[in-house]
UniProtKB/Swiss-Prot annotation:
<dbReference type="GO" id="GO:0006412">
    <property type="term" value="P:translation"/>
</dbReference>
<dbReference type="InterPro" id="IPR036967">
    <property type="entry name" value="Ribosomal_uS11_sf"/>
</dbReference>
<dbReference type="InterPro" id="IPR018102">
    <property type="entry name" value="Ribosomal_uS11_CS"/>
</dbReference>
<keyword id="KW-0687">Ribonucleoprotein</keyword>
<comment type="similarity">
    <text>Belongs to the universal ribosomal protein uS11 family.</text>
</comment>
<dbReference type="InterPro" id="IPR019981">
    <property type="entry name" value="Ribosomal_uS11_bac-type"/>
</dbReference>
<dbReference type="GO" id="GO:0019843">
    <property type="term" value="F:rRNA binding"/>
</dbReference>
<dbReference type="GO" id="GO:0003735">
    <property type="term" value="F:structural constituent of ribosome"/>
</dbReference>
<keyword id="KW-0689">Ribosomal protein</keyword>
<dbReference type="Pfam" id="PF00411">
    <property type="entry name" value="Ribosomal_S11"/>
</dbReference>
<keyword id="KW-0699">rRNA-binding</keyword>
<dbReference type="GO" id="GO:1990904">
    <property type="term" value="C:ribonucleoprotein complex"/>
</dbReference>
<protein>
    <recommendedName>
        <fullName>Small ribosomal subunit protein uS11</fullName>
    </recommendedName>
</protein>
<dbReference type="GO" id="GO:0005840">
    <property type="term" value="C:ribosome"/>
</dbReference>
<dbReference type="InterPro" id="IPR001971">
    <property type="entry name" value="Ribosomal_uS11"/>
</dbReference>
<comment type="function">
    <text>Located on the platform of the 30S subunit, it bridges several disparate RNA helices of the 16S rRNA. Forms part of the Shine-Dalgarno cleft in the 70S ribosome.</text>
</comment>
<keyword id="KW-0694">RNA-binding</keyword>
Amino acid sequence: MAKAPANNAAQRVRKKVRKNVADGIAHVHASFNNTIITITDRQGNALSWASSGGQGFKGSRKSTPFAAQVASEVAGRAAVEQGIKNLDVEIKGPGPGRESSVRALAALGIRINSIADVTPVPHNGCRPQKRRRI
């Protein structure tokens, strides 16, 4: 006798918890290959996130300002559904999506309180990788 397949999919579905958070922090990680945007509350609990690669951009198109803009819009819309109205933006990295991601968040009607560059800069710590030769 074969068992009937258990309906595990219905058991694993988690109900999305909607939080009412007015203030938050947008962490923008802009590398040369991708841009990742995470929107958190003041305590650091993630409310929403998106990346350029997750929005369907692959290869060199991930590292464009337009891909960062699309990812910011997706993360921003999800954060607005959670009740976000004000954001502090922390940008990390030298990538091309730095400015366009902030503009996309502002275009959604989210008030941007401050923009901070938190790119880690070594005080001559580890030796960098070898020079790239093309």
